[in-house]
């Protein structure tokens, strides 16, 4: 598995930047990813480009400009709205093989149940701290993240969030499931293999 550790304060998708990847097993440098937002590149650019085009299961794609859409790399998020993260990764590897790119980034989202569309509300660090002061959390093995839940009138509120430990567990699970490429704001705290030089 090749891991591309974006800096924790990476500039998102507004300016181009380059990320050196490393081999998960050996820790040796293994490839370079140029992140080039839509509209930032020359027409003849043939490197990876993030696009919001839908692929399989409403996931975004990471597609070389010179590759046909049906052969382009497929970008999926680690968040799993249905089933388990393990089943999501296993199914994605089976469907896309070497084309699969997993985006691994911390989540902090509040949901209201029932939640038929799977959409939640992003929660800031301060908001999350206030919620956790009032409601204890536990580890959720299905989603490989932390979870707090509580009743609120006739609904249930659910807070799902990541820690360095859960991100490290997600990265290890991705390797175990055969995910070929991972990218995101990984640090030495959540990935012991991330190079520091």
Tell where the protein language model's regions lie, with residue ranges.
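Hydrophobic faces of well-ordered beta-strands that scaffold small-molecule active sites
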Residues: 17-22, 32-36, 49-52, 60-63, ...
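A structural motif corresponding to the C-terminal end of an alpha-helix
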Residues: 91-100, 169-182
């Amino acid at each position: 598995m090749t891991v591309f550790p974006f800096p924790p304060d990476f500039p998102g998708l507004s300016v181009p930047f380059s990320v050196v990847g490393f081999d998960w097993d050996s820790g040796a440098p293994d490839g370079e990813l140029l992140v080039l937002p839509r509209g930032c590149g020359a027409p003849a650019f043939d490197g990876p480009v993030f696009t919001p085009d839908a692929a399989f299961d409403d996931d975004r794609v990471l597609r070389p400009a010179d590759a046909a859409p049906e052969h382009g790399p497929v970008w999926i998020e680690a968040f799993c709205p249905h089933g388990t993260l393990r089943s999501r990764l296993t199914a994605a590897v089976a469907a896309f093989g070497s084309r699969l790119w997993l985006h691994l980034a911390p989540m902090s989202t509040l949901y209201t149940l029932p939640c038929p569309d799977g959409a939640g509300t992003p929660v800031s660090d301060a908001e999350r701290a206030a919620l956790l002061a009032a409601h204890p959390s536990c580890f959720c093995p299905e989603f490989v993240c932390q979870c707090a839940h509580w009743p609120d009138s006739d609904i249930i509120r659910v807070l799902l969030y990541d820690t360095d430990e859960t991100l490290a567990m997600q990265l290890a699970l991705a390797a175990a499931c055969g995910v070929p490429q991972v990218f995101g704001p990984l640090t030495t705290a959540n990935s012991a293999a991330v190079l520091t030089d």
